[in-house]
Amino acid sequence: MLFKEAQAFIENMYKECHYETQIINKRLHDIELEIKETGTYTHTEEELIYGAKMAWRNSNRCIGRLFWDSLNVIDARDVTDEASFLSSINYHIAQATNEGKLKPYITIYAPKDGPKIFNNQLIRYAGYDNCGDPAEKEVTRLANHLGWKGKGTNFDVLPLIYQLPNESVKYYEYPTSLIKEVPIEHDHYPKLRKLNLKWYAVPIISNMDLKIGGIVYPTAPFNGWYMVTEIGVRNFIDDYRYNLLEKVADAFEFDTLKNNSFNKDRALVELNYAVYHSFKKEGVSIVDHLTAAKQFELFERNEAQQGRQVTGKWSWLAPPLSPTLTSNYHHGYDNTVKDPNFFYKKKKSNANQCPFHH
């Protein structure tokens, strides 16, 4: 079974990279021997890098796949000690942030006996009983159990919670200067500033498995950049997240939220305008939902030229604001899951997040 998965990946990758049949057969022969001797096999650095890029390209829920080949891959399979691990995490955050000019990065640790990360994302806000991000209550309780104490605000950056092999679970507070955040304001509605809203610059997913040719990498944090609606529609407005619709509408001086007033819709549009322009004002990369949809159209054309079928999950590719203005909305997608890919960990069954845009 493992060899068949390895064979499918190697043949696919090596043909895309224009390797001769003789080289492909030699590599497959070596892998088959290694599996017979050890029960597994080890990817070359080139295979790891290209496999990670293919995983992004195959991510059905991601609208930002046009840039799959620009992914920066850090091979951290040799990282085993705590100092090196924390240094590699800080390095990833710094390089991905890039002073606001965000770059897509993935750091891949060993498939076995590597460090374990308990956070859903490397950077997220704590969730308390009466404030913060309700989606992070479980991680916040774990952090508190380990001795971490937040300030009790809506936007306390959670520490990194991790475990090295044969060691206890620990937490690590990031240097304040490492985490770039964007205060949210609206140039036409100054009252919005009084809500003291902000959001972190880089979404770095850390609760998914990366699978390449049958080998699972359980710790492989990765990032792209935000699509504006992920913050302005989902994170701030969903009633199981920050649930800010009424407060935002009040800041915009909308006197009613009756359904037939259309003020709920207006509030969403104005808040997304505020998020987008706040990020741009701070020099932080972000994409609006209509541009992202156009980029996905280009991705589809590029893939068609290469003779590859684009798979996708329609409900994720149609943005949550004005979806009918995008081509994604108007046709279906084959949701077949290809390998390599990113997979939700089984214990995280409620973690419905897009790999590169959440």
From Swiss-Prot:
Pfam families associated with the record: NO_synthase
Entry binding sites for heme: 62
Reaction equations catalysed: 3 reduced [flavodoxin] + 2 L-arginine + 4 O2 = 3 oxidized [flavodoxin] + 2 L-citrulline + 2 nitric oxide + 4 H2O + 5 H(+)
SUPFAM superfamilies from the UniProt entry: Nitric oxide (NO) synthase oxygenase domain (SSF56512)
Single GO biological process annotation from the record: nitric oxide biosynthetic process
EC id: 1.14.14.47
Cofactor(s) the protein requires to work: heme; (6S)-5,6,7,8-tetrahydrofolate
GO terms assigned for molecular function: heme binding; metal ion binding; nitric-oxide synthase activity
EC class (word): oxidoreductase
Keyword terms of this UniProt record: Heme, Iron, Metal-binding, Oxidoreductase
Metal-binding found in the keyword field: yes
Quaternary data: Homodimer.
Misc note: This protein is similar to the oxygenase domain of eukaryotic nitric oxide synthases but lacks the reductase domain which, in eukaryotes, is responsible for transfer of electrons to the ferric heme during nitric oxide synthesis.
Purpose of the protein: Catalyzes the production of nitric oxide.
PANTHER family: NITRIC OXIDE SYNTHASE (PTHR43410:SF1), NITRIC OXIDE SYNTHASE OXYGENASE (PTHR43410)
Family, as annotated: Belongs to the NOS family. Bacterial NOS oxygenase subfamily.
Name listed for the protein in its UniProt record: Nitric oxide synthase oxygenase
Organism: Staphylococcus aureus (strain MRSA252)
Lineage start: Bacteria, Bacillati, Bacillota, Bacilli, Bacillales
Encoding gene per record: nos
